[in-house]
Amino acid sequence: MIQEIKQDGEARMQKTLEALESTFSKVRTGRAHPGMLTGVMVSYYGSPTPLNQVASVNVEDSRTLLVQPFDRTMVQAIDKAIREADLGLNPMTADVIRVPMPALTEETRKDMQKLARGEAENSRVSIRNIRRDMMNDIKELAKEKEISEDDERRASDDIQKITDKYIETIDSRLSKKETDLMAV
């Protein structure tokens, strides 16, 4: 029972970490990476389709993404979708689409850093809420005399260690993201 509570809680904490990673991948750092265009939807024969299903997105150099449509007739639609995605990007179109990354100003870097810190704090709060739920489940088992006080204390210590591990991971990922953001 205790093991199930810990496994369930740890799985939920892992999902929180994955959500943070996904959010961080969308925060612009001035360096090109394909994850920046993940949310772009292209009108493909009238229906909205994710960009990665109609084109391959690769890094051409550190400041340029190369978008190669699978169907040459989609070039204009992809160009339009990238412009309308409100990412602050201006694609250059030919047979392929090149998306240069604009240089980030100091103010933009600070805004992005603030956004990253906010997301990290939301993830920390989420981790703590999961810990609270796990602790409540353990206390409920102890109250119903299904586990001993020693088991309760041991499980609480284990849950705290798991929580600390995930909070530390969030902090290290935030630190790495801030370093990326502030690198000129």
From Swiss-Prot:
Domain of life of the native organism: Bacteria
GO biological process entries: cytoplasmic translational termination
Subcellular location: Cytoplasm
The keyword Metal-binding appears for this protein: no
Keywords recorded for this protein, A-Z: Cytoplasm, Protein biosynthesis
Key word Cell wall biogenesis/degradation present: no
InterPro entries recorded: Ribosome_recyc_fac (IPR002661), Ribosome_recyc_fac_dom (IPR023584), RRF_sf (IPR036191)
Pfam families in the cross-refs: RRF
Gene3D superfamilies in the cross-refs: 3.30.1360.40, Ribosome-recycling factor
Cellular component terms per the entry's GO annotation: cytosol
Recorded family membership: Belongs to the RRF family.
Designated name of the protein: Ribosome-recycling factor
Taxonomic source organism: Psychrobacter cryohalolentis (strain ATCC BAA-1226 / DSM 17306 / VKM B-2378 / K5)
Gene that this polypeptide is encoded by: frr
